[in-house]
Amino acid sequence: MMLHIPGVLTKEQVAQCRDILDAADWTDGNATSGAQSALAKRNRQLPEGSPAARAAGDAIQDALACNALFFSAALPLKVFPPLFNRYAGGDAFGTHVDNAIRLLRGTDFRVRSDLSATLFLEEPEHYDGGELCVEDTYGVHRAKLPAGDMVLYPASSLHHVTPVTRGARVASFFWIQSMVRDDADRTLLYQLDTQIQRLTAEKGGRDASVIALTGIYHNLLRRWADA
């Protein structure tokens, strides 16, 4: 499932993150690439664990912790600390798949990459190109979202970023280990939770159908969750 999550950051929060990022030193994006990705990747990136990356990343993690749609869709168990990249002057990232396991440098913190996330930090009208293109059974899905919006998609997906030919595309990217590793199971739970929330708004939390469906949701989560 590929999902657009609007307004993860407010415009004010985006501006605060950009103040941090624009004052930072950027390095070759291949610092975090696997062997396959390094062949296709051309961009700039904030060094992993740098003060700027930590400060902006903490702001994003705080926002995610308050985002009900993110929790419903991802069912996060672990979130890899957000990283940041910048594409300009023809930079692009060819078709690749993300590594299955991400290790935080200098620690024993590991994340199985069930989901990938890209949080846009530049308005789409300020640059040309830079679309995130995610492939699945049904074709290629493109994302170029307003600043503060995020796209969430299975980390097993082939994907690429088209060349940026004007301006600069700035974004955060990171990976999530879900409590439910299977994408189809996780999608079913998200769809069920969405309908439960709709019925709750219509009928109230004491309605018998709401209570029954909530029980089914939690029993499925109990069956499928790793946690």
Curated annotation (Swiss-Prot):
The keyword Cell cycle does not apply. Fe cation binds at residues 96, 98, 159. Its EC number is 1.14.11.-. Gene3D superfamilies: q2cbj1_9rhob like domain, Rabenosyn, Rab binding domain. InterPro entries: Oxoglu/Fe-dep_dioxygenase_dom, PKHD_C, PKHD_hydroxylase, Pro_4_hyd_alph, Pro_4_hyd_alph_FE2OG_OXY. One of its GO terms (molecular function) is iron ion binding. Residues 78-178 form the Fe2OG dioxygenase domain. Binds 1 Fe(2+) ion per subunit. Pfam families: 2OG-FeII_Oxy_3, PKHD_C. GO terms for biological process: DNA damage response; intracellular iron ion homeostasis. 2-oxoglutarate binds at residue 169. Keywords: Dioxygenase, Iron, Metal-binding, Oxidoreductase, Vitamin C. HAMAP family: Hydroxyl_YbiX. This is PKHD-type hydroxylase BPSS1206. It comes from Burkholderia pseudomallei (strain K96243).
